[in-house]
Amino acid sequence: MAILKIDAERLWRRIMELSEFTEPNRPWTRLAFGENHRRCREWVRAQMAEAGLSVGVDPGGNMIGTREGRRKGLPAIACGSHSDTVPNGGRFDGAAGLAAAVEIASALADNDVELDHSLEVIDFLAEEPNEFGTSCVGSRAVAGELT
């Protein structure tokens, strides 16, 4: 298979747009379960759909965009990050990884590339510590460690 080229402008646009979901007086604050996080996840869902992914939410609250592979039964290739931040967190914390994962799906779709394995782009729920005293909620759910 030839090396795929990503659309760097689209990737940068997605990173910048995602980073804009923040509290006006607390830059780069997108707390899990808050209004900014809810709106951000709606935007992420739309970006996943635009990239040709079918989007759903697993029992742990993770949003997962899936591009089906040619060979059923093979384990999925998973990539992604999280869309929440700590208060006054880094501008691109989570955003860059999530946007990059969506760009991988977009590049595959743009070039009509089919993989043997399914591709899953995951927005892990509540990875950062939050006001409920929890963190890594989504990834712990995937690992079977959420009790």
Which residues make up each language-model segment?
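N-terminal capping segment at the start of a domain
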Residues: 2-35
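Alpha-helix capping and helix-loop boundary segments enriched in small/acidic/polar residues
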Residues: 6, 89-92, 130
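General structural feature for long, well-ordered alpha-helical segments within catalytic domains
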Residues: 7-14, 36, 40-44, 75, ...
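N-terminal glycine-rich anion-binding loops that anchor highly charged ligand groups
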Residues: 10-23, 40, 55, 68, ...
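Conserved hydrophobic/aromatic pocket- or pore-lining residues that grip, position, or stack substrates
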Residues: 18, 48, 121
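Short secondary-structure junction/hinge motifs that connect adjacent elements
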Residues: 25-43, 60-65
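Catalytic-core environment of secreted peptidases
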Residues: 51, 59, 63-96, 101
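Acidic/histidine-rich catalytic neighborhood of metal-dependent amide-processing enzymes
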Residues: 86, 96-147
